[in-house]
Amino acid sequence: MQITDVRIRKIASEGKMKGIVSVTFDNEFVVHDIKVIEGQMGLFIAMPSRKTPDGEFKDIAHPINTEAREKIQTAILEAYEKAVSEEVVEG
């Protein structure tokens, strides 16, 4: 499965969440609402989730192995960094 599109919506407010992302796979399937979050060790992604009645968050969609997660995270963070650097050049 190939990542064929990554769309970034940057978040301008102060806080740990830096962007919301949609990723398209094989030009056929899209996953919306992946979050780019700034943690103590740098940027990482959080898959879309919902809050259960007991207050726990459960992923709606997520990769089932480490390789897939790393591939998705790398593509998202590269697109995010590119979007941020283009904003700096324009601004």
Curated annotation (Swiss-Prot):
At the top level of its lineage, which domain of life is listed?
Bacteria
Q: Which SUPFAM superfamilies does the UniProt entry name for this protein? A: SpoVG-like
Which InterPro entries does UniProt cross-reference here?
SpoVG, SpoVG_sf
Q: Which UniProt keywords apply?
A: Cell cycle, Cell division, Septation
Q: Name one GO biological process term.
A: division septum assembly
Xref: Pfam families? SpoVG (PF04026)
Which HAMAP family did the record assign? SpoVG (MF_00819)
| Family listed | Belongs to the SpoVG family.
Q: Name the job this protein performs.
A: Could be involved in septation.
Q: What is this protein called?
A: Putative septation protein SpoVG
Query: Organism source for this protein?
Result: Clostridium beijerinckii (strain ATCC 51743 / NCIMB 8052) (Clostridium acetobutylicum)
Q: Which gene encodes it?
A: spoVG
